[in-house]
A protein has these predicted regions:
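Short, well-ordered alpha-helical microsegments
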Residues: 16, 151-152
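A contiguous pocket-lining binding segment that forms or flanks enzyme active sites
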Residues: 131-138
Length: 195
């Protein structure tokens, strides 16, 4: 099991090809190739995890299952910082059955294609920093994860300002996406899903 504190932001990506060129020009290296991820968030019937701003997620990617718990985010207007614990799971279907027996239900499912990059030469104090490109049914986003100073520098180098920072979850972004289009939000899934 891995436990850590994560600090991250999302940035909107209006032009996927342009942002890929920019990432290459900034000397990032691809550490995890583009892959499909299927994510399921769990909660109790009374939505106590959502109410307390915690997340319990089961992810399937590259034929592996990963269970993640995220604690409530610290108070910050610019960054989302929270404790994160995660562990690989041998059998995600069996874990799903266990979670249901404990009273947890599927609260939200979402798909994305994800590509993970790291700085070729990390700046001092930014070891482990990551730039992630997520392609979702509700739009494309960059996630910058690392120290706040690294996030700010990297966002600026990519052409973004602090006003562009997003700390909302994919569930919240999808609700907003649906509401703006007069649709009832459900799960955020591609019409054709693939591993």
């Amino acid at each position: 099991m891995r436990q850590s504190s994560e600090t991250e932001i999302k940035l909107p990506v209006p032009d996927l090809a342009a942002v890929r060129r920019k990432i290459r020009s900034l000397d990032f290296i691809k550490v995890v190739p583009r892959h499909f991820e299927s994510n399921t968030l769990y909660d109790f019937r009374d939505l106590r995890l959502r109410t307390s701003r915690c997340v319990l997620r089961l992810r399937r990617a590259n034929r592996q299952w990963l269970l993640t718990f995220k604690g409530p985010p610290a108070a910050s207007l610019l960054y989302k910082s929270r404790v994160e614990m995660e562990t690989l799971v041998a059998d995600g279907e069996q874990l799903h059955a266990i979670l249901e027996e404990l009273g947890l239900k599927k609260a939200f499912r979402y798909d994305k294609y994800r590509t993970v990059f790291a700085p070729r030469l990390p700046a001092r104090g930014a070891c482990g920093a990551l730039l992630v490109l997520d392609e979702t049914p509700a739009g494309n986003y960059l996630e910058l994860e690392g120290p706040e100073a690294w996030i700010d520098r990297t966002a600026e180098r990519l052409g973004y300002r602090r006003e562009d920072y997003i700390t909302a979850s994919y569930a919240a972004l999808y609700r907003n996406h649906c509401e703006a289009r007069g649709k009832v939000p459900a799960d955020m899934l591609f019409k054709t899903r693939g591993d």
